[in-house]
């Protein structure tokens, strides 16, 4: 499995609402709608989505991007091309990880000129090229491309990684870095 890590710009400490916070931000109506739409598309009810948007605007970090917070539920959905894991946290925030469905891609017909994760096999070694792994926290999305190989259905290995991509609403990320955790895990942090 591949790891992705996103670190949010907001403080993990609650901020008293009676004092203006340096972490408070002003979101446009379009930004609020985009965040809310992302949250509700993954099953967060509208009222909870509005609550989370308000907390974000007032400088509160959501549980989904607070170090040490653990999800209270997780669901997984597989499609022909991807495996999507939605982790839900106590405050209602989510973390959605999307990686290629390697096994299904190996069985799918391959055509020339397609983009995204491409599969080929040579002897007992299976290769996936130009794959993408992404984590979406609604206000922050980040991920990277990578190549992957597997010999005899074991020894999975990420053979190349980068470039990365990201999108953030109401903030900025810096100091992007890759950390190789193991042969099969690479983490992108910011």
Q: For each of these PLM feature ranges, what is it?
A:
Residues 2-11:
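C-terminal segment of classical bacterial N-terminal signal peptides
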Residues 5, 78-80, 181:
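A generic structural signal for short, non-catalytic loop/turn and secondary-structure boundary residues
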Residues 2, 73-77, 134-136:
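Generic marker of residues within folded, mature protein domains
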Residues 99-190:
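Mature secreted bioactive peptide module from preproproteins
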Residues 12-119:
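N-terminal propeptides/leader regions of secreted preproproteins
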